[in-house]
Regions:
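Intrinsically disordered, low-structural-confidence terminal and linker regions
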Residues: 2-23
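Extended, alpha-helix-rich binding/interface surfaces that flank or overlap catalytic cores
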Residues: 19-95, 101-112, 118-208
């Protein structure tokens, strides 16, 4: 994921969070039904500026906030590859913003396994290996429950201190510094049938 794609993802994340805050504070932001149609032809001509068009239906539909069962259930209308792409997108957005600690601490940590599987599936093996080092340090597996992940981080921090943060920092730096092929786009455009979509989903909009 190059810097332009990443900036687009982070911008959307900021806008999404801002809209939620406005809803809470002013009640001026509401949800609306958005219709989208992504055909094989659309996907084959995809570029980095329209990358999030592929992700947005999953982003708005698949829940990461209500437990693992709901996460899987809310993803039922999408392909496995679409679910993996969402997990990878969440991973990059969170790690690039606040590191692996933030990714695991926040609700986004629920997608940790799909992120690793997605990296492997999309032939992004360098990313898979980098994240696997963090998972291995956490004992080889990570809970899908946020409270359990929070306690895991507390225990590791208390037990290993600076060593723990060194492992995280090294994994973070890899994400910040890595310049590789655009494997997500390559995979999507090589397998467009896995990412087609037609339907409606709820999204936020500002009434002002």
């Amino acid at each position: 994921m190059n810097m332009m794609m990443l900036k687009n993802v982070l911008l959307f994340l900021d806008i999404d969070n801002e809209n939620i805050e406005e809803t809470n504070e002013m009640g001026e932001t509401q949800k609306k039904l958005t219709y989208a149609k992504l055909t094989i032809e659309n996907i084959k001509s995809l570029d980095e500026n329209s990358y999030f068009d592929i992700v947005e239906p999953m982003w708005e539909t698949i829940s990461i906030y209500d437990g693992y069962d709901e996460y899987i259930q809310s993803a039922q209308t999408f392909t496995l590859e679409q679910r993996y792409l969402l997990a990878i997108t969440w991973y990059f957005a969170e790690v690039s913003n606040g590191g692996h600690y933030q990714f695991l601490y926040n609700p986004t940590g629920i997608v940790w396994e799909d992120a690793i599987k997605g990296f492997k599936h999309f032939a992004m093996n360098e990313y898979a290996d980098n994240f696997q080092k963090v998972v291995d340090y956490c004992g080889g597996t990570i809970s899908f429950g946020r409270e359990e992940r929070y306690h895991m981080l507390e225990i590791l921090e208390e037990k290993y201190g600076e060593e723990f943060f060194k492992i995280l920092d090294e994994a973070d730096d890899f994400i910040y510094d890595y310049e590789g092929e655009e494997n997500e786009l390559n995979y999507i455009k090589s397998h467009p049938e896995k990412f087609v979509f037609e339907g409606e989903y709820e999204s936020f909009y500002n009434r002002r």
